[in-house]
Curated annotation (Swiss-Prot):
GO biological process annotation, one example: chorismate biosynthetic process
Reactions this protein catalyses: 5-O-(1-carboxyvinyl)-3-phosphoshikimate = chorismate + phosphate
GO cellular component terms, A-Z: cytosol
Name this polypeptide is given: Chorismate synthase
Gene: aroC
């Protein structure tokens, strides 16, 4: 299987399956001298891990990270950083009914045709459990970006199924199981999700991700545009079916006089570009929206076929998220961080000595 490595300078290679002994990643290209402990990484893993509320999968995993290499006396050495997360709560017997049948909406059918074999236990490597390794790597990237530039990356859920969530303040995001920036709607969301779960069905979600204090100049102007690589990173997350940068699809109904972000000596007057122009960061907040499809694993019987092409009816057993989007925020933050750190290091390699005389107006209002 190819395609398990992300990045050009700050590279992350993930490994492991949902019901294997464990999963993890190898980070190469991390600058030396970054203070790093397992606690720095564990914070984000705890935000992503399963079993944290009745609205997510009840699989119980501690997701305790182990740093195996690349850190000495509390600091990165510049050598590969190996991170390991052991699986402890696999229940593979729940998947016996899909050993020779394909679950609708899953990668079972495509994996079988591509590789001629598949690990059906919990979806194997196609499971969203793989994203724990990305979150671990992203935590390292986030810490370096914060120390180097003061970059802060925040993600929150803006819609669950038909329920739109009003923004009240980022301080609410960590106070509820929905990663919602609104505490007043939590009871409504809990009632809604209880109904979804009891109906043996699932729903999708929409998330907003922002990166503040990003330096001007990250990204390349043609194929490696910053917005293109952000979209690539987000689309690589399980269940993501759409990505918007800045105004996104709302740009269709805007006039050029509205959409183009005007500049003044005091700063930009708007941010419809989402912090990126010509594939290069402007220094404004980078703003991204992603759409998450409904969880494919549901207990409602559905039609499919087995490996011989015979019709079957499948009701997925096991422990699954009725809305996988509720645990996507730390994953999306991690992927944005991995894009930004890689481009920051690429920019430093080529353009470290470049200095423009024009003031950085993105900093004028900070």
């Amino acid at each position: 299987m190819a395609g398990n490595t992300f990045g050009q300078i700050f590279t992350v290679t993930t490994f492991g399956e949902s019901h294997g002994a464990g999963l993890g990643c190898i980070i190469d290209g991390c600058p030396p001298g970054l203070e790093l402990s397992e606690a720095d990484i564990q914070f984000d893993l705890d935000r992503r891990k399963p079993g944290t509320s009745r609205h997510v999968t009840q699989r119980r995993e501690a997701d305790q990270v182990e740093i195996l290499s690349g850190v000495f006396e509390g600091k990165t050495t510049g050598t590969p950083i190996a991170l390991l997360i052991r699986n402890t709560d696999q229940r593979s017997k729940d998947y016996g009914n899909i050993a020779t049948a394909f679950r609708p909406g899953h990668a079972d059918y495509t994996y079988w045709h591509k590789y001629g074999t598949r690990d059906y236990r919990g979806g194997g490597r196609s499971s969203a459990r793989e994203t724990a390794a990305r979150v671990a790597a992203g935590a390292v990237a986030k810490k370096w970006l914060k120390e180097k530039f003061g970059t802060e990356i925040t993600a929150y859920v803006t819609q669950v199924g038909e329920k739109k969530i009003r923004f009240e303040g980022s301080e609410h995001i960590s106070q509820n199981p929905f990663f919602a920036a609104n505490q007043s709607q939590i009871a409504e969301l809990e009632h809604y999700m209880d109904g979804v779960r009891k109906s043996l069905d699932s729903v999708g979600a929409k998330l907003h991700i922002e990166a503040a204090n990003v330096p001007v100049g990250l990204g390349e102007p043609v194929f490696d545009r910053l917005d293109a690589e952000i979209a690539y990173a987000m689309m690589g997350i399980n269940a993501v079916k759409g990505v918007e940068i800045g105004a996104g699809f709302d740009s269709v109904t805007q006039r050029g006089s509205e959409h183009g972000d005007e500049l003044t000596p005091q700063g930009f007057l708007s941010n419809h570009s989402g912090g990126i122009l010509g594939g290069i960061s402007t220094g404004q907040d980078i703003c991204v929206n992603i759409a998450i499809k409904p969880t494919s694993s549901i207990a409602t019987p559905r039609r499919s076929i087995d490996i011989h092409g015979n019709p079957v009816e499948l009701a997925t057993r096991g422990r699954h998220d009725p809305c996988v989007g509720l645990r996507t925020a730390p994953i999306a933050e991690a992927m944005l961080a991995l894009v930004l750190i890689d481009h920051a290091l690429r920019h430093r390699a080529q353009n470290a000595d470049v200095a423009a005389d024009t003031p950085d107006i993105s900093r004028s209002d900070k």
